[in-house]
Amino acid sequence: MTFLVGENGSGKSTLLEGIAAGIGAVAAGAHDLSRDPSLRAAQTFASAFLFARRRHARTRLFLRAEDVFGFTNRIAATLQDLADDERELRETLPEGYGRQIATGAVAAQRGALTNSYGENPDGRSHGETFLALLRRRLVPNGLYLLDEPETPLSPSRVLALMALIHERAGQGCQFIIATHSPILMAYPGATILLAEAGRLTQAAWHDLEHVRVTRAFMADPHATLAKLLA
């Protein structure tokens, strides 16, 4: 379990994207990783590195919180296309075994997607969709690169995410996560790498600015706000 942390603009997301491109990770967004226009710079960045591995992860997935909307739209569009295809086959093919086979194949594809993502995959909240997607896509012995997964989640959902990650880590999964969440960073035994001034250094959770600022605010929000807004 490795966390990449740092201020906005520190380069942690760029590094994560470069790793994703370099290891040939699959993206869960609206585009494949190699065709995502927002990741062209990551492809160039990745070419400057030599990637080595001890073993080949069966699954390599890259997921940004903002990609979930595009992914669910893609699933919804695919479900609609399959429904249209099935209707067209019923209307154009003569009755018989051939039509039964053709429509059955399309219906099976649609049923598989529905079982995984529901009849209305974009009808859930962003946070619910994000967690449901992770539960479906995190399989044993995979390598997962998550960019700010806490973004659509309430604090209790962040804890649910941590529990899910812990469960999958016990199944041989490895995670590299770029985050601003002090809750996620507190995962026991995790390696925390701080991106600062163009360098990566290992850091302790209690020394991170994210933790110190949050702790100070929670200890006395009125005093903190009075000082800030004076």
What are these language model-derived features?
Residues G9-S10:
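ATP-binding Walker
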Residues D147-P149:
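Walker B catalytic acidic pair
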Residues L4-G6:
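Residues at the beta-strand->loop junction immediately N-terminal to the Walker
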Residues L15, I176-I177:
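Beta-strand elements within well-structured catalytic alpha/beta cores of enzymes
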Residues T2, S13-Y144, P155, A203-A230:
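Phosphate-coordinating catalytic segments in nucleotide- and nucleic-acid-processing enzymes
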Residues S156-Q174, S181-A230:
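C-terminal lobe/lid and adjacent interdomain/linker elements of RecA-like ASCE P-loop ATPase modules
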